[in-house]
Amino acid sequence: DAVSRLIYWMGNEYRGVNDFNLNFLKKMNFGLHELHPTAMLIAEDSTSYPGCTKPVDQGGLGFDYKWDLGWMNDTLDYFMKQSGERVSVAERLTFSMFYFYNERHLLPLSHDEVVHGKKTVIDKIFGNYEMKFPQCRALYMYMAVHPGKMLNFMGNEIAMIREWDETKQLDYFLLQYPLHDSFHHYIMDLNKVYLDTPALYEKDYDPEGFKWIAINDMQNNVYGIRRNGKQ
């Protein structure tokens, strides 16, 4: 992906770090923050190279956020399985918190996941047409309560079935169908709850802001999360 190909020679960590490119990234990010303090610089980086989101003056690369591609892959893999098979991959929904605070992670369900035969988010989920919707609502609820900012690509909010095509507009006609219309309203309501609940974002990058309260009932696919705000 984009940033890893700069960090390592041709994106291959076994060929070593590309110091020239690292210096370029540091100078670019530092300069952009100086010129545009409110700009968000986000790295798509699948490697574990340390300090991607650490400030340049502290030895980091200076990005504001980094895509948590591990969270994305694990979460989608979990929801692709039928209910009875999810026990075997139950740790996929908890593993991200073992490394989450190493960087300022962002949770991506991006354009990359709805093109080139990968299927759309809802179409990846196990089950028939009707079965996919409640599971997709659960996926987005999990995303909202998990620490980290959210990136949700256009079309996901209306449960697009057709993959993204940059030459066509989104399939807004889907909103005439009850399941898509209700899903659209669910996403709107979920976003409002998120914005109205400071505990869901105030301490995203502080370990005190998150706690598992139910994690030992994976046989029944039950997870419980507590989020804490500043008050």
Language-model-derived ranges and their functions:
Residues P178-K203:
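Catalytic cores of secreted or luminal carbohydrate-active enzymes
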Residues R5-E166, L195-Y205, G209-K230:
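Conserved alpha/beta catalytic core and glycan-binding cleft of carbohydrate-active enzymes
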Residues D165-Y177, I187:
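Aromatic-rich peripheral "rim/lid" segments of glycoside hydrolase catalytic domains that contact
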Residues D1:
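Substrate-binding cleft of carbohydrate-active enzyme catalytic domains
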